[in-house]
A protein has these predicted regions:
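Conserved N-terminal catalytic core of the sugar/cofactor nucleotidyltransferase
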Residues: 1-26
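Conserved core of the sugar-phosphate nucleotidyltransferase
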Residues: 6-11, 27, 39-137
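Short aromatic/hydrophobic "clamp" motif used to bind/position activated sugar donors
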Residues: 31
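Catalytic metal- and UDP-sugar-binding loop of GT-A-like glycosyltransferases, i.e.
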Residues: 34
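Hydrophobic helical membrane-anchoring modules
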Residues: 134-136, 140-173
Length: 173
C-alpha cells in the first residue's frame, strides 16, 4: 500500500510507472504532476513549463517554484531552552540581521506544475535527479490549512465569471 501519511511523490509515481511497464502500456516521455493542493493555475504557464523541459534535453525533471519574499538563511530554530539555533551553519545571530537583499533569492516549491521523466525514474529509481530544472511561476496559493482554503474560496467568488468564461471556451473546442 502506497497511500500512507508518510508516502512520497516518488512512491506513487514509481508505482504508477512500474505498473504501466508491467501492463505493457507505453508510458509517455513526460509525466505532468498537477497537485490538487494548488488548484488555481493558468494553463498558459503549464504550456510554458512543458516547452521549457522539452528544450532542456539533459534535464532529469522540472519543479515549479516562486521566489520567496524572505530567505531561509534568515530563519532559525528555537532550542529546548528557548535560545537561537542556526538553520544554516554559516548563519550567526548577527548574520540573520542583514538585509534580505544581501542574500541570493530562494524559490519555494509550489506544486503549480512538476514534470517527471518516466524512463529516468525507472532507470535511476529517483524522481527528480541532479538536473532538476527550476521553473519560476507566479506566486500561488497552496491549500495546506483551513486558512488557505478560505483564501481560495474568497478568490473563487471574486473571479467566478472569469472561470466560467474559461470553462465555456474549453467546452467549445
Amino acid at each position: 500500500n502506497i497511500s500512507k501519511k508518510d508516502s512520497t511523490d516518488f512512491d506513487f509515481i514509481f508505482h504508477f510507472v512500474r505498473w504501466l511497464k508491467k501492463e505493457g502500456i507505453d508510458f509517455p516521455k513526460y509525466l505532468i504532476h498537477l497537485r490538487p493542493t494548488t488548484p488555481i493555475r493558468n494553463p498558459k504557464v503549464i504550456k510554458k513549463a512543458i516547452k521549457f523541459i522539452i528544450r532542456k534535453k539533459k534535464s532529469t525533471s522540472l519543479r515549479s517554484g516562486h521566489i520567496s519574499a524572505e530567505t531561509f538563511m534568515k530563519w532559525f530554530y528555537k532550542s529546548d531552552k528557548g535560545y537561537f539555533e542556526r538553520v544554516h551553519k554559516s548563519m550567526t545571530a548577527e548574520n540573520i540581521d542583514k538585509p534580505r537583499q544581501k542574500f541570493r533569492p530562494v524559490y519555494i516549491p509550489n506544486g503549480y506544475v512538476d514534470i517527471y521523466k518516466p524512463e529516468f525514474i525507472l532507470k535511476k529509481k529517483k524522481l527528480l535527479g541532479s538536473q532538476m530544472l527550476v521553473f519560476e511561476t507566479p506566486r500561488c496559493i497552496e491549500v495546506d490549512e483551513i486558512y488557505d482554503l478560505n483564501v481560495i474560496n474568497s478568490l473563487k467568488e471574486k473571479n467566478k465569471q472569469k472561470l466560467l468564461n474559461f470553462l465555456n471556451k474549453i467546452k467549445r473546442k
